[in-house]
Design a protein with these regions (language model features):
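C-terminal catalytic/acceptor-binding lobe
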Residues: 1-73, 77-96, 251-254, 260-347
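Hydrophobic targeting segments
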Residues: 121-127, 143, 155-158, 176
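Acidic, Ser/Thr-rich intrinsically disordered and amphipathic helical segments
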Residues: 72, 95, 124, 135-138, ...
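A short, compositionally biased domain-edge/stem linker segment
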Residues: 103-115
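Conserved catalytic core of nucleotide-sugar-dependent glycosyltransferases
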Residues: 164, 168-170, 177-179, 188-192, ...
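A conserved acidic beta->alpha catalytic loop
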Residues: 119, 131-135, 160-166, 194-197
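Short, acidic, metal-binding catalytic loop of nucleotide-sugar glycosyltransferases
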Residues: 114-120, 132, 139-153
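Hydrophobic transmembrane alpha-helices of multi-pass solute transporters/permeases
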Residues: 3, 8, 121-135, 139
């Protein structure tokens, strides 16, 4: 049966090359959905806390495949080759500006959209930031070309914390979400640490029916998932999903714990987490050792009460005052965060 499916796929590919990726995708998705259904008596496995190996429904399109400007961009484009040539050497932001100034399609704030097909997702890339000026240009050097090859509409939001309070990564993500939604009706949010560099452009930065964990294999963890509930580094949710879970918690001052709380929120809302298959989720991390940032010692007490806090601490109790500036490649959102800006009522 599997051999027949493969043969049928080859025949479909040869006969459908000129009619556009959307039709081709629908045919192949239908064929694979039937295969999945015959195994599980459903279109999807019951447990979605897994890699996408079982759910993978299409191969990457061949080089000579034709798709049209009025069709939705495919998810698996010929331009997505897999391994990326990673260059971790420092580079000045001025040099990054010069490199991408040659592309007139990149608008102020780093907005870009494809011209040869209709983007499947409008993606806001949110980057929490403090004192990482040497890391940001390295990230942009890799992410911009990758997202262009994936034919996503995207923009970058650098959410920078100033002041004397410990770094609050989760609250910065909430601020970034609120500000990004003022610009465009984004439908996919990528929460991206500035020191995480993807190693494969087949790690598609779109969203799906379930929240997505992209950074599953980090070099600093020997390319192993530290634990099943690990949700750190790079994750993605649709706007609907993010609002349903009430965003990130605001109460995590210092590093550690906020990603575990996000995992709990996702599970409490009835979602599961999907992950890329195999080596697609590999990332290199820029060493930094949390320079000057304190570890949040109260994280375990908060995590024990994740469910009780979820409806009280997040997007619905967030207050802030932002200073907005624009770079050629990103929008900078500067905030001075304090605990008083996100007080939690007793639970």
């Amino acid at each position: 049966y599997l051999f027949m499916m493969q043969a049928q796929g080859i025949l479909i590919r040869d006969n459908m090359r000129t009619i556009g990726a959307q039709v081709y995708e629908q045919v192949v998705r239908s064929a694979y959905a039937k295969r999945n259904s015959s195994v599980n008596d459903s279109d999807y496995p019951l447990d979605l806390n897994h890699s996408e190996t079982f759910l993978q429904t299409t191969t990457f399109l061949p080089e000579d495949f034709t798709y049209f400007a009025n069709h939705t961009c495919p998810e698996r484009l010929p331009s997505m080759k897999g391994p990326i040539d990673i260059n971790m050497s420092e580079i000045a932001m001025d040099d990054i500006h010069e490199i991408f100034s040659k592309d007139p399609a990149i608008k102020l704030g780093g907005h870009w959209k494809p011209s040869d097909c209709m983007p499947r997702w409008k993606v806001a890339i949110l980057i929490p930031f403090r004192n990482r000026h040497e890391h940001l240009p390295v990230l942009l050097r890799h992410l911009i070309p990758m997202l262009q090859r994936q034919r996503l509409r995207f923009a970058f939001y650098v959410v920078e914390q100033v002041g004397t309070q410990p770094f609050n990564r989760a609250m910065l993500f909430n601020v970034g979400f609120q500000e990004a939604m003022k610009d465009l009706d984004w439908d996919c949010l990528i929460f991206h640490d500035v020191d995480h560099i993807p190693e494969s452009d087949r790690n598609y930065y779109g969203c799906g029916q379930m929240p997505r964990h992209f950074a599953t294999k980090l070099d600093k963890y020997m390319y192993l998932l530290p634990y099943t509930e690990f949700f750190g580094g790079v994750s993605g949710l649709t706007v609907e999903q993010f609002r349903k879970i009430n965003g990130f918690p605001n109460a995590f001052w210092g590093w550690g714990g906020e990603d575990d709380d996000l995992w709990n929120r996702v599970q409490n809302a009835g979602y599961s987490v999907s992950r890329p298959e195999g080596d697609t989720g590999k990332y290199k991390s820029i060493p930094h050792h949390h320079r000057g940032e304190v570890q949040f010692l109260g994280r375990y007490a908060l995590l024990r009460k994740s469910k009780e806090r979820q409806g009280l601490d997040g997007l619905n109790n967030l207050n802030y005052f932002a200073n907005i500036t624009y770079d050629a490649l990103y929008k900078n959102i500067t905030v001075n965060l304090t605990p008083e800006l996100a007080q939690v009522t007793e639970y």
